[in-house]
Amino acid sequence: DVARETELQFASELSNRLGNQVLLKREDNQPVFSFKLRGAYNKMAHLSPEALKRGVIAASAGNHAQGVALSASKMKCKAVIVMPITTPSVKIDAVKARGGSWVEVILHGESYSDAFKHAEFLEKKRGLTFVHPFDDPDVIAGQGTIAQEIFQQYQEPIDAVFVAIGGGGLISGIGEYVKAVSPKTKVIGVQASDSDAMNRSLKANKRIEMKDVGLFSDGTAVKLVGKETFRICKKVRSEEHTSELQSRLHLVCRL
C-alpha cells in the first residue's frame, strides 16, 4: 500500500503539563508528511480500471496534491493537478517529484477557488475523475483509517480524540469510526478562529461560507465545508474549539 501505519506517540511534556495522558498520531511521518495521502489513495483504489485508464484530476496547493501525485505514480494512473499560480515553487516541485511522468501540473488562477473551478471544467472536458480533497465518501473513509489504527494501537479506553478541521474530511472519517467502536469517546474538532467555517456552519445548522480565511494554517483554511462532511459532523462531533493566532504561535514555540 501507499500510505503507512503511523506511530501513536506518547507526548510526555504535554501530558505532564495538562495532567492527562496525551498521545499524538504521527501522520507527519507519512511519505508526503500528511494524512491526505490516505484519502487520495483510497479514492483512487476504488476506481474502476476504465476510470483509472482515463485518469484523475485534483485541485490543491499542498498536501492533497502530493497525495494524489504519489498515488498516481504507484498505481500507474495519469493525474492532472491544478494549482494556483501563487503556489510556492517548492510545493510545485514536490508534486512533480512525487508523480513523475504520471502527473501533469497546471497552474491556474490566483486562489484555490480559481484552481478548483478550472479543475471541474477540465474534469468534464477530458472525462477525468475528480479526487476531492475532503467531500467524498471514499476520501472520508480513507482518513478514517487513522482512527482504526489508534484503537488497534491503544487498548485502554480513550476519553477524547482531538481532530483539526478544515473542510471536514478528517474529522468525518475519524468521527464515524470512533462513534461506531467507542460511542462514549468524545470527538472534538479544533479550528483556527479565523477559518472556522465548520464551527460557524454547525452553529447555524447550515453551511456558512466565509468571505476570507486566515492563512497561518493554510492546510485548514477552507471557506466552505463540504455537504457530506457537514452532514457527518452534525452526527459525530462532540464539541468544537477555536484558537487565536497568538495562542497557536505560543504553543508552537513551547513545543
What are these regions (language model features)?
Residues 245, 252-255:
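Hydrophobic alpha-helical segments, chiefly the membrane-spanning helices
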Residues 1-243, 247-248:
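PLP-dependent amino-acid enzyme catalytic core
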